[in-house]
């Protein structure tokens, strides 16, 4: 869990199908058609990392491939916009437009973030538009960002799943 990363080490979350983030690895056997997000955080020499990728098990259906391609497109566009002088909202506008144009919903309960000596630092980087553009933080040289595209096929609603108090899944 996240405490392992904060005290030094590695944290891996495995998010299967309706799990958006923080899926706890277990004995579940994956099957063809599953969508699996692998989220890895490492604390090394006083600094944190946070990275993830999402893949399909086996050959994805056309609708699953479109879903995965949309996430990659949204991330790539946001990365291209992440330049000094831009505002966080430039990234948010692009991510929200990309996922919603494809027919998906941007998750509003979770955001990307700055990262460095602490796992979650300012600025928050939502994949949806919030607040006034003029008050959105400006990107400056030296910022390290964890740009996270969190989106659902259904509604944007998420909920803590099970009794673990950690796993967050879609509500539909």
Segments (PLM) and residue ranges:
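Active-site neighborhoods and metal-handling regions in enzymes and metal-associated proteins
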Residues: 1-172
């Amino acid at each position: 869990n996240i405490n392992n990363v904060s005290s030094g080490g590695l944290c891996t979350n495995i998010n299967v199908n309706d799990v958006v983030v923080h899926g706890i690895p277990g004995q579940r056997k994956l099957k063809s058609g599953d969508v699996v997000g692998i989220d890895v955080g490492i604390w090394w020499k006083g600094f944190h990392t946070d990275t993830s990728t999402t893949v399909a098990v086996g050959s994805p259906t056309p609708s699953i491939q479109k879903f995965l391609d949309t996430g990659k497109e949204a991330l790539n566009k946001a990365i291209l916009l992440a330049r000094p002088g831009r505002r966080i909202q430039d990234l948010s506008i692009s991510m929200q437009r990309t996922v919603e144009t494809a027919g998906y919903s941007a998750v509003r309960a979770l955001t990307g973030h700055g990262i460095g000596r602490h796992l979650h630092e300012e600025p928050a980087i939502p994949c949806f538009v919030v607040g006034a553009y003029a008050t959105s933080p400006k990107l400056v040289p030296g910022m390290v960002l964890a740009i996270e595209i969190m989106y659902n096929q259904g509604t944007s609603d998420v909920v803590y799943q099970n009794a673990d108090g950690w796993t967050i899944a879609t509500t539909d």
